[in-house]
A protein has these predicted regions:
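Generic detector of well-ordered alpha-helical packing
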Residues: 23, 85-86, 231, 237
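Tryptophan-centric aromatic hotspots in well-structured domains and transmembrane helices
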Residues: 14, 18, 47, 54, ...
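Predominantly flavin-linked oxidoreductase catalytic cores and closely associated redox partners
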Residues: 28-192, 250
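FAD/FMN-dependent oxidoreductases across multiple families
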Residues: 148, 168-286
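C-terminal helical "tail/cap" subdomain of flavin- and related membrane-associated enzymes
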Residues: 255-410
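Alpha-helix N-cap/helix-initiation motif
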Residues: 10, 14, 18, 101, ...
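Short amphipathic alpha-helical face segments that pack within enzyme cores
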Residues: 20, 24, 111, 245-252
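Conserved N-terminal/central alpha/beta ligand/cofactor-binding core
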Residues: 1-41
């Protein structure tokens, strides 16, 4: 299946190397006047509710930075707000009590991953009818249980990761064993060489591993602090929603923090409630795909729930880039949300007894095509399209973050 996320290569925004993104954001922050402290640890943070002010003690590892001294340095700073952008680690301070609250999540997956040189192109799957080169896209190689991602960057490195249920054991050896059991993947990786990430105690590359990626915190905010979406919760890389979700949080929090204190807290309370609903929604969009496995046809059918959500959401952004739509990825859409719930329940009911009702499940793509018809303007599940969609969303330039920021600055 091929679905174009961008109308043209010039507007595409996929396959960002994380280190490049981080460097870009750091440069933008500096240009905007922010002070950037790298290799710095938060030792303590104390909040004064009367003054609405934090007093924070920081420690910088001068051996890793351009400090004048070779000894670690400590500094004290004050701030009215702390924005938690730490990701899964969370801020470690007694003043912020925010335990894990992931029990509600349907998606429970882990991953083992690395950056490789020498990954071969996936020529075997190409077709003259392809709307674009599949190697230029985020590839999802579906297994009976789980999947393998391949993201080819333009400097010869490919990010490869194996995603499976969190109950599955993870190791570099297991990664290669799974690939060897799938000849098409084994052929792609036959001459691949691991180049990153580097091990903590050596310069030798060692594959990274996360036992459970799916997570959520109890709260998105508290007195004087607030989380970006990536720190509050994350579901799974299946639909590549993480960066977009976090950027949506940047836009919303910027607007809230620039308002007066009363309006700010009200906006942040709303933001927190929205984040919980958004994580639940993304969880639903992902979990249904896993519930559909090992059927490729049913997986594609349920994946259309994500595609419709993305198309409708980006359509709203394109109409008015200066107005943030209510509900990330249509999670507040009163017409669309029941359709996705219905599709998910259909799959779950058919598998509740652990004896899959194959005749019923075989009808799932037909049902989905009927359910999505009012929104389906691009030919999803249309036999004539042969699962190849050349155009699905509005031009990215119309919904750029730059356009949103210009509107916020007015």
């Amino acid at each position: 299946m091929l679905v174009a996320a961008s109308a043209r290569d010039a507007w595409s925004d996929t396959h960002w190397v994380r280190s490049s993104v981080d460097a870009f954001l750091a440069d933008q922050a500096r240009s905007a006047g922010a002070t950037l402290l790298e290799s710095t640890q938060l030792l303590s943070a104390r909040f004064d509710p009367l003054e609405h002010r934090w007093t924070c003690t920081l420690k910088t590892d001068c051996a890793k930075t351009a400090c004048a001294s070779t000894e670690d340095s400590e500094a004290s700073i004050e701030a009215t707000w702390i924005v938690d952008a730490t990701g899964h680690q969370g801020l470690q301070t007694p003043s912020i009590d925010n335990p894990d609250d992931s029990s509600f999540m349907h998606t429970r997956t882990g991953a083992v991953f690395g950056h490789f040189e020498g990954v071969a192109p996936f020529v075997a799957a190409s077709s003259p009818e392809d709307p674009f080169c599949g190697d230029d896209a985020a590839q999802h190689h579906l297994l009976d249980e789980g999947w393998v991602w391949m993201l080819r960057f333009d400097h010869g490195v490919t990010s490869v990761g194996l995603v499976q249920p969190s109950s599955t054991q993870r190791s570099e050896g297991m990664f290669w064993e799974v690939l060897e059991r799938h000849p098409s993947l084994a052929e792609l990786m036959q001459h691949a060489k691991l180049v990153a990430p580097l091990g903590q105690d050596s310069a030798k590359p060692t594959m990274g591993s996360v036992d459970r990626m799916s997570r959520c915190r109890a709260r998105a905010s508290g007195p004087g602090w607030v989380c970006l979406p990536v720190s509050y919760g994350f579901v799974d890389p299946l639909h590549s929603s993480g960066i977009a979700h976090s950027l949506s949080g940047v836009v919303r929090l910027a607007e809230a923090l620039l308002s007066d204190r009363n309006d700010c807290y009200e906006s942040i309370r709303t933001y927190g409630a929205d984040l919980r609903r958004e994580i639940q929604w993304l969880d639903l969009l992902v979990a249904g795909c896993y519930a559909a496995q090992p059927s490729f046809e049913n997986f594609i059918a349920y994946a259309c729930m994500y595609f419709v959500s993305a198309i409708e959401f980006e359509k709203q952004l394109a109409v008015d880039p200066g107005r943030w739509p209510k509900g990330f990825m249509q999670c507040h859409d009163s017409r669309w949300v029941p359709v996705v719930n219905q599709a998910y329940e259909f799959l779950v009911r058919s598998d509740q007894t652990h004896v899959r009702n194959e005749p019923t499940l075989s009808q799932f793509p037909i049902q989905v095509r009927r359910w999505i018809e009012p929104w389906n303007r691009v030919g999803l599940l249309d036999p004539a399209s042969a699962n190849r969609i050349s155009h699905s969303v509005a031009p990215k330039y119309a919904s750029s973050i730059e356009g949103l920021c210009r509107s916020l600055a007015k």
